[in-house]
Amino acid sequence: MLKPERPSNPIEKPSILILGTRGIPASHGGFETFAERLALFLAGRGWKVGVYCQKEVERVGERVTIDTWRGIELITIEVASRGPRATLEFDWQCVLDAARRPGVCLVLGYNGAVFLTWLRLMRRRIITNMDGIEWRRPKWGPAARAWFWLNEWIGAWLSQRLIADHPAIADHLATRRPRSAIATIAYGADPVTSAPEEPVRALGLEPGKYLVSIARIEPDNNILPIIEAFRRRDRGDMKLVVLGTLNDEIPYHRAVREAAGTTVIMPGAIYDQATVKALRYHARAYMHGHTVGGTNPSLVEALAAGNMVIAHDNRYNRWVAGEAAIYFNDTDSLSARIDEALADDALVARCSKAARARAREAFRWEDVLSAYEK
C-alpha cells in the first residue's frame, strides 16, 4: 500500500511522512492513536518515519523543530492562530515542509486537501485516509459543508491512493475515483482481558453497575437521546457514564447537562487510556449513538474490551459491531434496548462473546498495520 519511494542510495531506509493529526504521542482522538501505532510499527520494520505535530504558541519563533521519540522524527510546527485557522495554518505549513523532505506522504483526513496541490506539483506520492463523510454532518452550516465537500473532491483526485476505513466509505469514494484507486483498511484495537477496578471506583461507580458512552458531545452522536432514554424510568442503582468535553457556551451541551440529573455521571473527556479501558471493561454495556462516519475507533475498542453494545441502527455500526450489538432507531427503542441489557444476563454474555470474536476477526492491529505497509 505505502510503496516506498526508491531511495537514491541503496542503503537508505524507505521513508514516510504522516500528516493530518495533532501529533504523537497520542493524547487526543483516533487518528492520533492510529498515527502512533503505525509510526512505531513502521519504524520497527526499518522505515524512516516522520510525524507532524502541532504546537500552539503566542508568537512563532522557530517554525519547525525536530525531536526523536522511540526512533520516530517528531516534526513540530509552531502556529500562532487559534481555532479553525490554526488547523489551516498547521496543514499548510506541514505541506510546505513535507515537500522538502523525502518519503511517501500519508495524509490522515481531507479537511485541508486543497493544500495537497503543492505536494503534487512537487511530484510527491500522496496516500490519503479519507476518514468519514464530514460534509454530511448536520452540525455544519452551508459554508463549512461546502468547504468539506470541495476538499473531499480535491483530496480524492490529488491522492494517488485512497484509504477507506469502512466498506460504505469505499462505496462513497467510488463515486469520486475508480475502485482500483481505493483500499479498505479498518481501525485496530488491542484486546482488553482484564482491568483494575480502582479507576472505576474513583468515579463513584461499581463494576457492572453502569453503562458507558465515549463520544464527542454532538447531536449526530445522539448523546441527548441516550441520556433521555436512560432516565425515562427508574434504573435502580444503575448509572450512565458519558465521557466527552462539555462547553456550556454551546446550546446542545447545556441541554445535555440539564438532562443528566443525578444518575448520569459526566466526568468530561478522559485521555488516560488505562482509565478509559477500565471504564469500558467493567461496564454493563457500551452505548454508541453515532449516525455518520465509517469505522469508529471507540466502537472498535468497545468490541475489543468485550462490551455488549447498544448502537444506533445504521450501515456503519451494523458492519462494525454485527451480532455484538442490539440496535435502536429512536428514544423509545433505545429505552427498550436498555431494559433488555439490564434484565438479560444471557444476552449480555452472548453479545460480549460476539464482540471479542468480531474484534479478533476484523480489527487486530497487526493486520491493520500490515495492510497499510503492503
Question: Where is each model-derived feature located?
Answer:
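Conserved donor-binding/catalytic core segment of Leloir-type glycosyltransferases
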Residues: 17, 204-232, 241
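An aromatic- and histidine-rich active-site surface loop
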Residues: 86-131, 135, 294
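Aromatic "clamp/platform" in nucleotide-sugar-dependent glycosyltransferases that forms part
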Residues: 291
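Nucleotide-activated donor-binding/catalytic signature segment of Leloir-type glycosyltransferases, i.e.
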Residues: 253-274
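Membrane-proximal helix-turn-helix segments that form the acceptor-binding/catalytic region
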Residues: 99, 144-162, 256
